[in-house]
A protein has these predicted regions:
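Beta-lactam-recognizing serine transpeptidase/beta-lactamase-like catalytic domain environment
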Residues: 57, 179-192, 231, 235-276, ...
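Periplasmic/cell-envelope proteins involved in peptidoglycan metabolism and beta-lactam response
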Residues: 1-255, 345-357, 473-477, 502-552
Length: 552
């Protein structure tokens, strides 16, 4: 018996030595694996601001309420009712969440911190919290189509939020903690690995100009009972987009009833036949060739022109017009006669060089190339109609970029949504400086009383631009629904801004671009020039405006 007792004692000592010394590290690791946990520490998503630092998107701290279902089911009835009430859900909904056999379940995401504190004070079994963030958009529907929004998991789903997801995201940190068997944190063990917050994205957008464009476009869409609309403001020196608005829009802070029509960034995604806003490009090609001058006379009588079996007509018959007057009075016949003086290749290359048929490459979702037919399939009638904006499709952003070539003395350049401290890249020359300036003079004529858009004039400033009025196509056929547009630039002597406006399906009488889109351009351009501190350059209009204020 003594020997047996001594043997047992020796075995116990040996086992203890093995456990305490030889296998200590292994056992300690197994033990720690049961109560040590690495917890991810969320990084804050980067802010999005306008060019002046005003907030467009910011992350606010919130809480996720989660549960270990098996433990949470031990809550009393009153505890469950209290938790459900704090989370603004029914007791039945809460019961269904914790009825699962899973070991983890989200009870509710993005709970306000003050609510989470009240829940924590209840010390409910199996109910836990983690920090997360919720995206907030201070400017709401005004900037929704540019900024976009994130989902509940803080990932970008639209706009800049999606396009710059990796830069905005940041990197989470971590900390090692001790939890009890119920999942409660007892203490921190390892020092915090700090999270790296996402980068701030500063847009080229100017919130004041954005608000101006939004309010004026909204008023016009409501006045004309239109289906939709869009407006863009571009700084021609840098290619920066100072404003981009669409209607209808939506509130990114409350997307419960968001529809596809509200979500569409129409200025980038919607294409349409532009109509007469294309005519200045045809005139520029003719001037650039040296075949005509602004004062060259074109016979537009009797206001009709037959090509094959098709007849092209002017809205109002004209007789003899100079090239400048063809643009000013928006003659289809005169424009077609200019266009048919060139082989299809030359006209196609010009349209391609100013960006038609190409995506604008802003880096945001939804950009389209629109439609510029391959030159190999151009017939005379196709070339004729494209010269005045039919048989070709464009987006509003393409028109804004294309008109920048006249503002930049014949050079085209890229557009950008992001503010850059670097000098803008050199442009690509499309037209000579002389041609660009001659077209600007014609565009200024178009807003005079004898032109098609006197309502687009801006008191105190010399401006120029072109109207567009085009039928819409539905089911492969033209219907009596209109797209009214106006694209212009100012100050005309040294343009700083291009403003493009489109109103989709105006009703109630007026539908011409000069009547519907022209006044919107006037308000947006005038307000933008004043916001940027650009001095008036038309003393005659300044005097007229001052005299008008003194009348009874």
């Amino acid at each position: 018996v003594g020997l047996l007792l001594m043997g047992a004692f020796a075995a116990l000592v040996g086992r203890g030595f093995y456990l305490q010394v030889i296998n200590n590290d292994f056992l300690q690791g197994k033990c720690e694996s049961r109560y040590l946990r690495d917890i991810e520490v969320s990084a804050s998503r980067g802010k999005i601001t306008d060019r002046n630092g005003d907030l467009l998107a910011v992350s606010t701290p919130m809480k996720t309420i989660w549960a270990i279902p098996g433990d949470a089911r031990t809550m009393s009835g009153p505890q469950k009712q209290r938790l459900a009430a704090l989370l603004d859900m029914s007791a039945r909904e809460l019961e269904s969440k914790i009825a699962t056999e899973k070991t983890f379940v989200f009870v509710k995401r993005q709970v306000p911190p003050e609510t989470a504190e009240r829940i924590a004070a209840l010390k409910l079994p199996g109910v836990h919290q983690e920090k997360e963030y919720r995206r907030y958009y201070p400017t709401g529907d005004m900037t929704a189509h540019i900024v976009g929004f994130t989902g509940v998991d803080d990932k970008g789903l639209e706009g800049v939020e999606l396009a710059f997801q990796q830069s905005l995201l940041g990197r989470p940190g971590s900390r090692t903690v001790i939890r009890d068997r119920r999942g409660n944190i007892i203490e921190d063990v390892v020092a915090l690995k700090p999270p790296q917050d996402g980068k701030e994205i500063r847009l080229a957008l100017d919130s004041k100009i954005q608000y101006l464009a939004y309010s004026q476009l909204k008023a016009a869409v409501e006045k004309h009972n239109a289906k939709a609309g869009g407006a863009i403001v571009v700084d021609t020196r840098t290619g920066e987009i100072l404003a981009l608005v669409n209607l209808p829009t939506y509130n990114p802070n409350n997307r419960d009833r968001l529809s596809g029509a509200q979500l569409r960034n129409r200025a980038l995604t919607d294409t349409f036949e532009p109509g007469s806003v294309m005519k200045p490009f045809t005139a520029a090609l003719a001037l650039e060739s040296g075949k005509v001058r602004p004062e060259t006379v074109i016979n537009c009588a009797p206001g009709r022109l037959t090509i094959g079996s098709a007849t092209i007509s002017d809205a109002h018959p004209h007789g003899a017009l100079t090239v400048a007057q063809v643009v000013q009075k928006s003659s289809n016949v005169g424009t077609v006669k200019l266009a048919l003086g060139f082989p299809p290749r030359e006209m196609w290359e010009m349209l391609d060089s100013v960006g038609f048929g190409q995506a604008p490459k802003l880096g945001v979702p939804g950009e389209v190339t629109a439609r510029l037919r391959p030159r190999e399939i151009w017939r005379p009638i196709a070339q004729a109609t494209m010269s005045y904006g039919h048989g070709v499709s464009v987006s509003l952003i393409q028109l804004a970029r294309a008109y920048s070539v006249f503002a930049r003395d014949g050079e085209t350049g890229p557009l950008t949504l992001i503010r850059s401290e670097e000098p803008p890249p050199h442009g690509v020359r499309v037209f000579s400086q002389q041609t660009a300036r001659e077209i600007r003079a014609m565009l200024e004529m178009a807003v005079q009383p004898e032109g098609t858009a006197p309502k687009a004039r801006v008191p105190g400033y010399r401006v120029g631009g072109k109207t567009g009025t085009a039928y819409k196509i539905e089911g492969g056929a033209y219907v009596r629904k209109y797209i009214a547009s106006f694209i212009g630039l100012a100050p005309i002597g040294d343009p700083r801004l291009v403003v493009a406006v489109m109103i989709d399906e105006p009703t109630g009488g007026a539908h011409y671009g000069g009547d519907v889109a022209g006044p919107v351009f006037s308000q947006i351009m005038g307000g933008s020039l004043r916001t940027l501190g650009i001095p008036p350059d038309d003393p005659i209009q300044v005097a007229e405006a001052a005299a008008g204020k003194g009348r009874l």
